[in-house]
């Protein structure tokens, strides 16, 4: 993979980090397509497959249009399950992802795959609370401050 990548999926505040550049994630699935030679971001889209069946259909079309060999970073935020279609799951499978989140409300998904890869070959994590996958050495460490008390 020509880029340092960190994908963190959380219920509120998921992020994709590509060579130190943070890309925010809105509710649903976010996909970031990379240039296979340079690792530069070619495009990124968000699909709210929790609320809109049309976004599942749009996700499937988006993935179908990608060229073979394109690296794709996937993150979820909040929920992706309620309107996720079989076609969208199959499209994600064409990136090497194995997990099917239909019927798994509020489960989080983080993955790094390649268009045309065999199902189950992507780097992938699924968890109820937070899911993270990393390739390479992230250039910046993110510190999350959960509380601060001044006296």
Locations of regions flagged by a protein language model:
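Short acidic-hydrophobic catalytic motif
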Residues: 1-71, 76-151
């Amino acid at each position: 993979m020509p880029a340092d990548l960190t994908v963190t999926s959380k219920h509120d505040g998921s992020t994709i980090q590509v060579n130190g550049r943070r890309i925010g994630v809105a509710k649903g699935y976010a996909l970031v397509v990379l240039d296979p030679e340079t690792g530069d971001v070619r495009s990124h889209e968000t699909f709210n497959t929790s609320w809109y069946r049309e976004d599942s259909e749009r996700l499937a079309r988006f993935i179908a249009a990608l060229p073979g060999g394109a690296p794709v970073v996937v993150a979820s935020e909040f929920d992706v399950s309620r309107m996720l279609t079989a076609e969208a799951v199959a499209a994600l499978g064409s990136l090497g992802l194995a997990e099917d989140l239909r019927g798994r409300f509020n489960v989080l998904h983080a993955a790094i795959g390649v268009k045309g890869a065999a199902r189950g070959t992507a780097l992938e994590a699924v968890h109820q609370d937070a899911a993270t996958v990393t390739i390479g050495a992230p250039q910046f460490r993110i510190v999350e401050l959960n509380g601060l008390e001044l006296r």
